[in-house]
UniProtKB/Swiss-Prot annotation:
The keyword Magnesium does not apply. This is Urease accessory protein UreD 1. It comes from Brucella melitensis biotype 1 (strain ATCC 23456 / CCUG 17765 / NCTC 10094 / 16M). The gene is ureD1. Belongs to the UreD family. InterPro entries: UreD. Its main location: cytoplasm. One of its GO terms (cellular component) is cytoplasm. UreD, UreF and UreG form a complex that acts as a GTP-hydrolysis-dependent molecular chaperone, activating the urease apoprotein by helping to assemble the nickel containing metallocenter of UreC. The UreE protein probably delivers the nickel. One of its GO terms (molecular function) is nickel cation binding. It is found in: Cytoplasm.
Length: 280
C-alpha cells in the first residue's frame, strides 16, 4: 500500500513542457511547398491547403500555455524563391511561475528571392509570470521579411492586472551577415509600475513591434502612420539595398491594439493579407 503525503511529494519535480517545431519551405513546380517538417513534444505545425500564394503554416502549442521551466523552440527556413506566412493557432499564454523562466526561441532563415512573414498572435503574460523570448533572423540579400510580435500584460476584460512579472525580449536580425536590427527589451519585476512610465508605455498594457525589411518598405510609411495614429510611431531606415520599416504600437488592452494592428498587418503583408486564424 502506497501512502502519499507532503513529505514524499516535496522532492518531486513537475513535468515541464518541451517543444520543437522545424519547417523548411522550397519553391517547386510553381508553388511554395514543404521540404522538411519536424515536430517534437508540445510543438505542432499544421498547413491549411492552398493552391496559390505563399505557404501558410499554423504553429500550435498543445500544452495550452507556458510557465517556469517550459521551453518552446521554432525554426523556419525558406529556400530560394519560396514564400511563407507563419502564424499561431491562438495567443500564447505565460502563466504564473513556480520557479524559473519560460523560454520561447525562434530562428528564421530566408534565402534570396524569398518572402517570409512571421505573424504570431499575441503573447499574454499573467501576474507573476517570467518569460524570456528570443528571435534570431538570417536574411540573404534580396529576401523580404515581415515580423510582428505583440505582447499583452493581463486581460483587462477579464479583470486581470499584472503587478509583478519579468519579461525579456531579444531580437537579432541580420541581412547578408550584417546586423541591421537589434533589441534588448526588459521589464520587471515591478511591471505594473513600470508600464505607467511615459518613457515605457504611458499606462498601456498592450504593445506590438512590427519590422519590415524589403527594398520598397518606404512606400508604406505614410499609410502606416495614418493607421497607427498618436499611440505609437513609425520610422524608416536604409540598410544597404533594402529599407527597414519599424513600427511601435501601444494600447490600453488587446482589443484596442488589434483595431490598429490588423489593418497594419493587412497593409504590409500585401496580397497574402491577414492570416485567417487572426479573425476566428
Amino acid at each position: 500500500m502506497l501512502i502519499i503525503n507532503d513529505n514524499n511529494l516535496s522532492g518531486l519535480s513537475l513535468q515541464r513542457v518541451n517543444g520543437t517545431g522545424e519547417l523548411s519551405v522550397q519553391f517547386k513546380d510553381g508553388r511554395s511547398r514543404i521540404s522538411r517538417l519536424y515536430q517534437e513534444g508540445a510543438a505542432k505545425i499544421r498547413m491549411p491547403q492552398a493552391v496559390t500564394g505563399p505557404l501558410e503554416a499554423i504553429l500550435i502549442n498543445t500544452s495550452g500555455g507556458l510557465t517556469g521551466g517550459d521551453r518552446l523552440k521554432w525554426d523556419v527556413a525558406l529556400d530560394d524563391g519560396a514564400s511563407a506566412v507563419i502564424t499561431t493557432q491562438a495567443c500564447e499564454r505565460i502563466y504564473r511561475s513556480g520557479g524559473g523562466e519560460a523560454r520561447i526561441a525562434t530562428r528564421l532563415k530566408a534565402a534570396k528571392g524569398t518572402r517570409l512573414a512571421w505573424l504570431p498572435q499575441e503573447t499574454i503574460l499573467f501576474n507573476r509570470s517570467i518569460l524570456s523570448r528570443r528571435l534570431d533572423v538570417e536574411l540573404e540579400e534580396g529576401a523580404q521579411m515581415l515580423v510582428v510580435e505583440a505582447t499583452v500584460f493581463g486581460r483587462l476584460a477579464m479583470g486581470e492586472r499584472v503587478v509583478a512579472a519579468r519579461f525579456a525580449d531579444r531580437w537579432r536580425v541580420r541581412l547578408g551577415g550584417r546586423v541591421i536590427h537589434a533589441e534588448e527589451f526588459r521589464l520587471g519585476p515591478d511591471v505594473g509600475a513600470e508600464l505607467q512610465a511615459t518613457a515605457v508605455a504611458g499606462g498601456a498594457c498592450a504593445m506590438a513591434t512590427v519590422l519590415m525589411v524589403c527594398e520598397q518598405a518606404g512606400r508604406h510609411l505614410e499609410t502606416a502612420r495614418a493607421i497607427i495614429g498618436e499611440e505609437g510611431g513609425c520610422s524608416l531606415w536604409r540598410v544597404g539595398k533594402a529599407s527597414k520599416l519599424v513600427v511601435r504600437l501601444y494600447a490600453p488592452d488587446s482589443y484596442a491594439l488589434r483595431r490598429r494592428l490588423c489593418p497594419l498587418v493587412a497593409l504590409l503583408n500585401g496580397k497574402a493579407g491577414l492570416p485567417k486564424v487572426w479573425t476566428i
